[in-house]
């Protein structure tokens, strides 16, 4: 019987070729990621509870200061100072400090994550490494500390849900709509402790694929792996990692992208997804473009294509927080950033921004936000009384122009709503 991507990668990491779903395996990890919010507790666990003096391999550890970057409080500044000193003391090779961006895209940009690798991180959206066809999985403090000490961890090999795409997107529709469609179809628990394989999106860049990989955790997945076809020479695929026709899947679903309409996740659950046409006229206060799910160059460019020559609607704030400095520099070099600024958007430091509700644009009670991120739970971006609608960068930009949740086509096909600079 053939193997899924999860079975192949976990088999390779465990030194076994016969791995199947349900097996228990001890695996060697290729990279451990830890970020600023959990690093202090991980460091304490590593040294005080496990008794380890040093990490097992300083070249296979990446520390990223991205969750509250720059620090918003003295306590956060002290914690980040502690992390920097620890990194220097350990001789760790890879520290990505304030302004470099979010761990998931940054580690792929740096070439630290490649197809077939096994990566564990102290963040639930570590499934994002599947954008580069790696097995990425989030873990808690103790498991990350153990991986730092030994270079190993264990998994029950997950079953796999296969999500197929056919066709291509119509104007105004993009990969975020596909990801939200999958959340709507599979539901929040539809892939609990399973791997999600994404197929049929070879035309997407790895950054666009990250939308799918990061949304995998929102259906309960242990990992979300996008088929590596089309990744390019900078992401060489090992010969042993391949699609096997006779692999066994727990479920297979298919989406015709050519008929897909814009999707919106309405408060307060990610899988509470409806067609945009069914949302009604919802006025918004804030449009927030960012996160590891949709804060990349491609997302900023998509928004800029709608905002070009237009201004934000009165009483709408638009905050753009790039996912990485690389995406920010690219947007600055080709005029994308200038277009966003001309429209009235505010640009933040690359990083997680308000995604965890701790700084850089948190919401007040009763405020309505269209967010290109991945979660819309109560209190996710600040006040529990705020309402968060998840949508694509295209929908976000169109909404910023009109002041209410809007199909991109309504702005692109009409000059009436445009206010030219």
UniProtKB/Swiss-Prot annotation:
<dbReference type="InterPro" id="IPR001030">
    <property type="entry name" value="Acoase/IPM_deHydtase_lsu_aba"/>
</dbReference>
<dbReference type="GO" id="GO:0009098">
    <property type="term" value="P:L-leucine biosynthetic process"/>
</dbReference>
<keyword id="KW-0408">Iron</keyword>
<feature type="binding site">
    <location>
        <position position="355"/>
    </location>
    <ligand>
        <name>[4Fe-4S] cluster</name>
    </ligand>
</feature>
<keyword id="KW-0004">4Fe-4S</keyword>
<keyword id="KW-0432">Leucine biosynthesis</keyword>
<dbReference type="Pfam" id="PF00330">
    <property type="entry name" value="Aconitase"/>
</dbReference>
<keyword id="KW-0028">Amino-acid biosynthesis</keyword>
<keyword id="KW-0456">Lyase</keyword>
<keyword id="KW-0479">Metal-binding</keyword>
<dbReference type="InterPro" id="IPR011826">
    <property type="entry name" value="HAcnase/IPMdehydase_lsu_prok"/>
</dbReference>
<feature type="binding site">
    <location>
        <position position="352"/>
    </location>
    <ligand>
        <name>[4Fe-4S] cluster</name>
    </ligand>
</feature>
<keyword id="KW-0411">Iron-sulfur</keyword>
<comment type="function">
    <text>Catalyzes the isomerization between 2-isopropylmalate and 3-isopropylmalate, via the formation of 2-isopropylmaleate.</text>
</comment>
<dbReference type="InterPro" id="IPR006251">
    <property type="entry name" value="Homoacnase/IPMdehydase_lsu"/>
</dbReference>
<comment type="similarity">
    <text>Belongs to the aconitase/IPM isomerase family. LeuC type 2 subfamily.</text>
</comment>
<feature type="binding site">
    <location>
        <position position="292"/>
    </location>
    <ligand>
        <name>[4Fe-4S] cluster</name>
    </ligand>
</feature>
<dbReference type="GO" id="GO:0046872">
    <property type="term" value="F:metal ion binding"/>
</dbReference>
<dbReference type="GO" id="GO:0003861">
    <property type="term" value="F:3-isopropylmalate dehydratase activity"/>
</dbReference>
<dbReference type="InterPro" id="IPR015931">
    <property type="entry name" value="Acnase/IPM_dHydase_lsu_aba_1/3"/>
</dbReference>
<dbReference type="InterPro" id="IPR050067">
    <property type="entry name" value="IPM_dehydratase_rel_enz"/>
</dbReference>
<protein>
    <recommendedName>
        <fullName>3-isopropylmalate dehydratase large subunit</fullName>
        <ecNumber>4.2.1.33</ecNumber>
    </recommendedName>
</protein>
<comment type="pathway">
    <text>Amino-acid biosynthesis; L-leucine biosynthesis; L-leucine from 3-methyl-2-oxobutanoate: step 2/4.</text>
</comment>
<comment type="subunit">
    <text>Heterodimer of LeuC and LeuD.</text>
</comment>
<dbReference type="InterPro" id="IPR018136">
    <property type="entry name" value="Aconitase_4Fe-4S_BS"/>
</dbReference>
<keyword id="KW-0100">Branched-chain amino acid biosynthesis</keyword>
<dbReference type="GO" id="GO:0051539">
    <property type="term" value="F:4 iron, 4 sulfur cluster binding"/>
</dbReference>
<dbReference type="InterPro" id="IPR036008">
    <property type="entry name" value="Aconitase_4Fe-4S_dom"/>
</dbReference>
């Amino acid at each position: 019987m053939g193997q899924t991507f999860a079975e192949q990668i976990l088999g390779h990491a465990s030194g076994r070729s016969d791995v199947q779903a349900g097996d228990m395996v001890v695996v060697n990890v290729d990279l451990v990621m830890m970020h600023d919010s959990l690093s202090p507790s991980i460091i304490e666990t590593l040294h005080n509870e496990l008794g380890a003096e040093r990490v097992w391999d300083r070249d296979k550890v990446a520390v990223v200061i991205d969750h509250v970057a720059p620090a918003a409080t003295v306590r956060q500044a002290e914690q980040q100072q502690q992390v920097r000193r620890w990194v220097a003391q350990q001789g760790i090779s890879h520290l990505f400090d304030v302004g470099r961006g979010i761990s998931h895209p940054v580690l792929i940009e740096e070439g630290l994550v490649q197809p077939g690798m096994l990566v564990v991180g102290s963040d639930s959206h570590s499934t994002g490494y599947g954008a580069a066809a790696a097995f990425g999985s989030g873990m808690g403090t103790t498991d990350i500390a153990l991986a730092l000490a030994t270079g190993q961890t264990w998994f029950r090999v997950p079953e796999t849900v296969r999500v197929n795409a056919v066709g291509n997107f119509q104007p105004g529709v993009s990969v975020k709509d596909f990801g939200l469609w999958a959340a709507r179809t599979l539901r929040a628990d539809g892939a609990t402790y399973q791997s999600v394989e994404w197929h049929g999106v070879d035309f997407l860049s790895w950054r666009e694929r990250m939308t799918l990989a990061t949304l995998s955790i929102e259906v309960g997945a242990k990992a979300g792996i996008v088929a590596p076809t089309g990744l390019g020479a900078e992401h060489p695929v090992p010969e042993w990692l391949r699609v096997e026709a006779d692999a066994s899947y727990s479920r297979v679903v298919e989406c015709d992208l050519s008929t897909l309409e814009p999707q919106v996740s309405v408060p307060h659950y990610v899988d509470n997804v409806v067609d945009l046409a069914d949302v009604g006229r919802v006025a918004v206060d804030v449009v927030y473009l960012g996160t590891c799910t949709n804060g990349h160059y491609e997302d900023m460019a998509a928004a800029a294509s709608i905002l070009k020559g237009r201004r934000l609607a009165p009483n709408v704030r638009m905050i753009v927080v790039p996912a990485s400095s690389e995406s920010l520099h690219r947007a600055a070099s080709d005029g994308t950033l200038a277009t966003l600024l001309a429209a009235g958007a505010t640009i933040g430091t690359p990083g997680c921004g308000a995604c965890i509700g701790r700084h850089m644009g948190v919401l007040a009670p009763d405020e309505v936000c269209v967010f290109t991120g991945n979660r819309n739970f109560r209190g996710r971006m600040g006040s529990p009384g705020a309402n968060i609608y998840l949508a694509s960068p295209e929908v976000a930009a169109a909404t910023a122009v009109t002041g209410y949740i809007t199909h991109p086509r309504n702005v692109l096909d009409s000059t009436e709503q445009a206010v030219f600079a």
